[in-house]
């Protein structure tokens, strides 16, 4: 009986000593044929989940008379963002010019129509081949440089993407409330 108790204490001491011995336990397990499986390649990982929030202002996409109207928002899943960031606004008004500008980086495009004051919140799925989630707001009179954004997919997955859509500009925030609009001039 005393031998069994001594053996149990010895085994417990060895196990506890292995916890602080820089992977000796892992090496021992590997020697017996037990090891941690290798990390999956990106193509085999499940798609990323991104909390997407589009918050439209009551004064959304104002026309020349100052009246709010519906806004087409395009959501892009891209491999890279270079072509997206270099394309002029007019390229996004024509499907063929859009495809030509984005080339092989374009994985998927989807259009969402927003009405003034609407909140659109959804969990968007991004395949691992998508490096960026990009958005274009097709305003009637877009403010210079405030009608598109591209966010790294990993960042979007981690904190979500909140966009405020206003009279002629888009604001980008990572929290549940859209960032405030700085002063911009509508064209």
What are these regions (language model features)?
Residues 1-8:
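Bacterial N-terminal signal peptides that target proteins for export
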Residues 15-18:
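C-terminal motif of bacterial Sec signal peptides marking the signal peptidase cleavage site
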Residues 20-23:
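Bacterial signal peptide processing site
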Residues 27, 148-187:
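Glycine-rich, aromatic-bearing surface loops/beta-hairpins
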Residues 28-53:
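Post-signal peptide N-terminal segment of mature Sec-exported envelope proteins
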Residues 43-46, 79, 125-130, 155-158:
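A short, structured loop/turn motif at beta-sheet edges
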Residues 52-64:
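Short amphipathic, basic-aromatic surface patches that mediate peripheral association
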Residues 68, 75-146:
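Mid-length scaffold segments of soluble, non-membrane domains
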